[in-house]
């Protein structure tokens, strides 16, 4: 999608997710087997901070007015995680999948996704790894700069 406003991209993700749910619901009601589509959105965002449902707004070290003055936006989202930053130059991937087509163990899914990212980065000569106790793919594990991560 290129460089896109976070809210616009979020709305698009919600639309794709709703389509998957509608197909699954119709399949159950009408005893059909129409397959659901899987999507991978790749994009960049303007400066944005998100707060996941397991996060704490106290972890945002500046107020929203400061963010606005810097051209950044802030969004509370219904996904896991804490405070996450996205911005220009950072490629973000959003898989919108029906996990029933794969496996329903979210932790297994996340480990497979991390491994796919690690192997893809390796193809481009970039070394990355998991960080114990954290979800995501990281460059320079142990470095305090979270900007060096892939979530």
Regions found by a protein language model. Give the residues of each.
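Catalytic cores of processing enzymes, dominated by hydrolases/peptidases
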Residues: 147-151
């Amino acid at each position: 999608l290129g460089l896109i406003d976070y809210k616009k991209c979020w709305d698009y993700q919600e639309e794709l997710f709703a389509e998957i749910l509608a197909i699954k619901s119709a399949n159950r009601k009408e005893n059909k087997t129409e397959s659901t589509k899987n999507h991978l959105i790749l994009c960049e965002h303007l400066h944005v901070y998100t707060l996941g449902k397991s996060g704490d707004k106290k972890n945002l070290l500046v107020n929203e007015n400061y963010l606005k003055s810097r051209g950044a936006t802030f969004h509370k989202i219904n996904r896991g995680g804490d405070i996450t930053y996205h911005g220009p130059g950072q490629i973000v991937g959003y898989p919108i999948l029906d996990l029933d087509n794969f496996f329903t163990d979210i932790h297994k899914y996340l480990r497979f996704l991390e491994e796919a990212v690690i192997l893809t980065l390796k193809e481009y000569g970039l070394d990355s790894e998991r960080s114990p106790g954290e979800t995501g793919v990281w460059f320079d594990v142990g470095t305090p700069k979270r900007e060096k991560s892939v979530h």
